[in-house]
UniProtKB/Swiss-Prot annotation:
It comes from Staphylococcus aureus (strain MRSA252). PANTHER family: 60 KDA HEAT SHOCK PROTEIN, MITOCHONDRIAL (PTHR45633). This is Chaperonin GroEL. The lineage of its organism: Bacteria, Bacillati, Bacillota, Bacilli, Bacillales. SUPFAM superfamilies: GroEL apical domain-like, GroEL equatorial domain-like, GroEL-intermediate domain like. It is found in: Cytoplasm. It catalyses: ATP + H2O + a folded polypeptide = ADP + phosphate + an unfolded polypeptide. ATP binds at residues 29-32, 86-90, 413, 476-478, 492.
Length: 538
């Protein structure tokens, strides 16, 4: 394919137009009075959302240079979402502010490498100051506040807080769509282990890249499955029952894996293969846990059992199994209650007896998976459009609360970034490095400025007053009042704020040091002339 090139100022200005188009679409959503964005969906109803990363992913521009600029900011949103699970709009606003301010200085003759050094220096100091100002999340009420601020809904914050209380901070919390109007919380018995599907062709939902199996059979074995013939008799019985199957084995490979994938793609049956969790003796113990939870029989040479002789009665069952690239969650296994209780008691005894800290930790993990549970937040809404929007907000809020538990919380509403302004301004630097520090200083005020503007106020006035306010005191755009943000529960997770700043600075620095851009020239489709009719035909 033929390529076209742009250099220096032409290249950067073209990319800046793309940055601005994407950022302007995203930043209208920030703050309590932020607006929604409507996304056109080709085969379904339009999606109404205020989720930054969802909006960013949808944007594709016609001009290849502008599109590259937009993709750079998409990367900021994606990375922030990947690390912290929220804060994508803040990251986008920060990136745009740094790129715009940086480009003014590059155009005026500043050295981009010096600017980059200044940006890196300033961000390092800002992150250290954020951690110094961070407070630990210590109770259920604070967790609820984080969730409520992220989702702009107190009810959602309460549900997440209750879910984390019931299954623990590291417990498994899933979000499902409900058929009703109300959002509800359920805690279901379940087990999760860190093994995902062996082939992406096994997924049932290609948008989320997840395999969801309803009422599946579950085969549990410590054997390697290489030959499809070994499991064919068993699969024939499963096909007759018209139910999916989860295969948990040491490994599924060779023609066994090929045939499972081919039959899945043809629609003959739905099967998902995952590797057994753990290693060595611990793997056998974890397979036994899974078998007891689901009512399965472990197919193993230790018991003289062979895959060819396995019957459907040896399989376990569960109400639902969800398999992602990295994890498998078994919900509501049909194992015998007495057997599960006996296994739990056995694990508790082993925890008391063991002298190894490592073994104790692993036993406690197994106990939590067996006796703990999976919290399910069932999202209800009046329409499909509202349901999707609400589900996205709950996912963001859940990620925010987990991030808050991990690294603590800081004052929300962009206040935390302005609170570190003083520390960053004290950095001793000169020349282009000092200019780089000033770029970050201006960007630190951008989220507050945008939140104020979305609330119909003059951003510059709010920023100047905030710079002179006591640490922690900020502007509540929902009520137009100046309050102590931490005291009234307007908080952001430190991890979210930190990640947004770091990823925005990283992409801005790369943008400013770009000197040439190479893009593909779109191929033009020449219209084919209409073919004339054959002689004698009408």
């Amino acid at each position: 394919m033929v390529k076209q090139l742009k250099f220096s100022e032409d290249a950067r200005q073209a990319m800046l137009r793309g940055v601005d188009q994407l950022a302007n679409a995203v930043k209208v959503t920030i703050g309590p009075k932020g607006r929604n964005v409507v996304l056109d969906k080709e085969f379904t109803a339009p999606l109404i959302t205020n989720d930054g990363v969802t909006i960013a992913k949808e944007i594709e521009l016609e001009d290849p240079y502008e599109n590259m600029g937009a993709k750079l900011v998409q990367e900021v949103a994606n990375k922030t979402n990947e690390i912290a699970g929220d804060g994508t709009t803040t990251a986008t606003v920060l990136a745009q502010a740094m790129i715009q301010e940086g480009l003014k200085n590059v155009t005026s003759g500043a050295n981009p490498v010096g600017l980059r050094q200044g940006i890196d220096k300033a961000v390092k100091v800002a992150v250290e100051a954020l951690h110094e100002n961070s407070q630990k999340v210590e109770n259920k009420n604070e967790i609820a506040q984080v969730g409520a601020i992220s989702a702009a809904d107190e009810e959602i914050g309460r549900y997440i807080s209750e879910a984390m209380e019931k299954v623990g901070n590291d417990g498994v919390i899933t979000i499902e769509e409900s058929n009703g109007l109300n959002t509800e919380l359920e805690v279901v018995e379940g087990m999760q282990f860190d093994r995902g599907y062996q082939s992406p062709y096994m997924v049932t939902d290609s948008d989320k890249m997840v395999a969801e199996l309803e009422r599946p059979y579950i085969l549990v074995t410590d054997k390697k499955i290489s030959s499809f013939q070994d499991i064919l008799p068993l699969l024939e019985q499963v096909v007759q029952s018209n139910r999916p199957i989860l295969i948990v084995a040491d490994e599924v490979e060779g023609d066994a894996l090929t045939n499972i994938v081919l039959n899945r793609m043809r629609g003959t049956f739905t099967a998902v293969a995952v590797k057994a969790p753990g290693f060595g003796d611990r793997r056998k113990a974890m397979l036994e846990d899974l078998a007891i939870l689901t009512g399965a029989q472990v197919i193993t040479d230790d018991l003289g059992l062979d895959l060819k002789d396995a019957t459907i009665d040896m399989l376990g069952t569960a109400s639902k199994v969800e398999v992602t690239k990295d994890n498998t969650t078994v919900v509501d296994g049909d194992g015998d209650e007495n057997s599960i209780d006996a296994r739990v008691s056995q694990l508790k005894s082993q925890i008391e007896e063991t002298e190894s800290d490592f073994d104790r930790e692993k036993l406690q993990e197994r106990l939590a998976k067996l006796a703990g549970g999976v919290a399910v937040i069932k999202v209800g809404a009046a329409s499909e459009t509202e349901l999707k929007e609400r589900k996205l907000r709950i996912e963001d809020a859940l990620n925010s609360t987990r991030a808050a538990v991990e690294e603590g919380i800081v004052a929300g509403g962009g206040t935390a970034l302005v609170n570190v302004y003083q520390k960053v301004s004290e950095i001793e630097a000169e020349g282009d490095i000092e200019t780089g520090v000033n770029i970050v200083l201006k960007a630190l005020t951008a989220p507050v400025r945008q939140i104020a503007e979305n609330a119909g106020l003059e951003g510059s006035v709010i920023v100047e007053r905030l710079k002179n306010a006591e640490p922690g005191v900020g502007f509540n755009a929902a009520t137009n009042e100046w309050v102590n943000m931490l005291e009234v529960g307007i908080v952001d997770p430190t991890k979210v704020t930190r990640s947004a700043l770091q990823h925005a600075a990283s992409v801005a620095a790369m943008f400013l040091t770009t000197e040439a851009v190479v893009a593909s020239i779109p191929e033009k489709n020449n219209d084919q002339p209409n073919m004339g009719g054959m002689p004698g035909m009408m």
